[in-house]
Regions:
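Metal-cofactor-binding active-site regions of metalloenzymes
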Residues: 1-168, 177-181, 189-194, 200-217, ...
């Protein structure tokens, strides 16, 4: 399974090149900030895919990459702002776009359609966008991402209360740039089922115990953590300590086009670095 994948940056560079002749280079040395990551995105993604057709191509490329890696469950979805930008505020267009690419390119993959929220956006704006999404059972989960320091996580309580009413799995990016305590705060305020990243939990034994007792899953992306400077190297990635303590963890790709982080490579890197054994990695794979 790949339960942490941002489809805009999650696709196969080979698929994109074959369709467009455009080469996208991944980064090879750690970045110093999210700003540097945004600069990379502007350079290599920018306006190249800033159209309905470009968006559809990126969706197709993500299914192509997942198929190549043998992924069986893929959780991806559009950011709410994309509904008006690329799909004429027609929610059925978004749903059908993902479903059609799924059926045509990788019908063997279970698609879990996700609603994406950018943390820097105002809650009023997000609620307005979300009015188109509520009530559509095709959506499986909701995820909040972006700058963890952009605004208080408490601001998003009304959104997550509504999402819970709609039966969505509740997720958010926390504990990548923030603290271990931020993870508990987010889980308690938003009633999260899963946390994207959450690696800061390793800093606090009480937080680790909390995650275990409350069955909170962490969907962790190792190469992303290393290349964004959140972890010193793969051999010492905190996923090992969290797994050994009994925290529910999965391995995700995050942004394949940036980090060259295909799921198969993530498992291989964790094994080759000595971070986790093949038996431990297989256990994580099956659990995911």
């Amino acid at each position: 399974a790949d339960l942490h994948n941002h489809f805009v940056l999650g696709g196969s560079r080979e698929y994109i090149f074959n369709k467009t002749g455009y080469k996208i280079k991944s980064i090879t040395t750690p970045l110093k900030s999210m700003g540097e990551m945004d600069s990379w995105s502007s350079k290599y993604i920018g306006n190249h895919f800033n159209s309905p057709e470009g968006r559809k191509l990126l969706i197709e490329a993500t299914f192509a990459q997942a198929k190549f890696d043998g992924v069986t469950v893929l959780e991806i979805g559009e950011d709410v702002w994309g509904l008006g930008e690329f799909f004429d505020n027609d929610i059925e267009k978004i749903i059908l776009c993902f479903q059609e690419a799924n059926a045509r390119i990788a019908p063997e993959i279970e698609l879990r359609l996700q609603i994406g929220l950018s943390r820097h956006c105002s809650v009023d704006y997000l609620m307005n966008c979300l009015s188109h999404f509520w009530g559509h059972k095709e959506f499986y989960s909701i995820d909040l991402y972006g700058d963890e320091l952009a605004q208080s996580i408490a601001n998003f309580i009304p959104i997550y209360d509504k999402a819970a009413e709609n039966g969505l799995v509740l997720k958010a990016h926390v504990g990548e740039w923030g603290t271990a305590k931020d993870i508990i705060t987010a889980v308690e305020l938003l009633h999260l089922n899963e946390v994207q990243h959450g690696i800061a939990a390793v800093q606090d034994e009480n937080v680790i115990e909390y995650l275990i007792e409350n069955n909170i899953r962490l969907n962790i992306t190792p190469s992303s953590n290393v290349l964004l400077g959140r972890v010193s190297d793969m051999a010492h990635h905190p996923i090992a300590q969290l797994y050994h303590r009994g925290v529910d963890v999965t391995i995700g790709s995050d942004d394949v086009l940036i980090f060259n982080s295909d799921i198969s490579k993530e498992y291989l890197r964790l094994y080759q670095s000595g971070c986790l054994t093949k038996e431990e990695l297989d256990d994580i794979r099956i659990n995911g």
